[in-house]
């Protein structure tokens, strides 16, 4: 089986996602207890894509996260660095312009997109700050970023229960439904090591984003961070 280490070497992370691509969406639905749909809807509302706007969906995987933007009439570009995920996505949604790309070295010109979004992917990037700067670079002045990521529950008793779920319950569930359960051990470990809500907001600000704010979902299990590029 394949899993990445917490130093997040790009080739390790890409290989890990190559191995889970076929059953990735199903596994996410099971492990999130069905909450993934509600989280995607919250992302779509926060991005607020409009007809003819250009939206970059980073770490888009199979493009499940891209579809809500396409339905608004926006031009959405699903971008990922896992060839396995891109291949599955192309088989399912051949009409979308799938693009291979590393979040720290995006293959796009400056000031192109009205919105850039990344769901459950920033945590897997080796250099978070470089990725935030690249998102800023490719966003047009006045545009926005929306980041959806696992975070830290705000209520201490629930935080304890959630940590137990990550470390004890999640691995056996993953073994039952995933093609690469070891990847979900990495998932649990990377969530625990991820910065909390204020810390990530600070990093967005240092990357250039203004009016940074966040909203907790499911008690802080997931958090939406949003920022804007000054006009």
Curated annotation (Swiss-Prot):
Top-level enzyme category: transferase
Residues reported to bind S-adenosyl-L-methionine: 62, 80, 102-103, 119
Molecular functions (GO terms): demethylmenaquinone methyltransferase activity; methyltransferase activity
Protein family: Belongs to the class I-like SAM-binding methyltransferase superfamily. MenG/UbiE family.
Residue ranges the record marks as coiled coil: none
InterPro entries from the UniProt entry: SAM-dependent_MTases_sf (IPR029063), UbiE/COQ5_MeTrFase (IPR004033), UbiE/COQ5_MeTrFase_CS (IPR023576)
Role noted for this protein: Methyltransferase required for the conversion of demethylmenaquinol (DMKH2) to menaquinol (MKH2).
Known EC number: 2.1.1.163
Pfam families (alphabetical): Ubie_methyltran
Entries under PANTHER family matching the protein: 2-METHOXY-6-POLYPRENYL-1,4-BENZOQUINOL METHYLASE, MITOCHONDRIAL, METHYLTRANSFERASE
Highest classification ranks of the organism: Bacteria, Bacillati, Actinomycetota, Actinomycetes, Kitasatosporales
Organism: Streptomyces coelicolor (strain ATCC BAA-471 / A3(2) / M145)
GO biological process, one term: menaquinone biosynthetic process
Reactions listed under catalytic activity: a 2-demethylmenaquinol + S-adenosyl-L-methionine = a menaquinol + S-adenosyl-L-homocysteine + H(+)
Pathway membership, UniProt: Quinol/quinone metabolism; menaquinone biosynthesis; menaquinol from 1,4-dihydroxy-2-naphthoate: step 2/2
Keywords in alphabetical order: Menaquinone biosynthesis, Methyltransferase, S-adenosyl-L-methionine, Transferase
Origin: domain of life: Bacteria
Protein name stated in the entry: Demethylmenaquinone methyltransferase
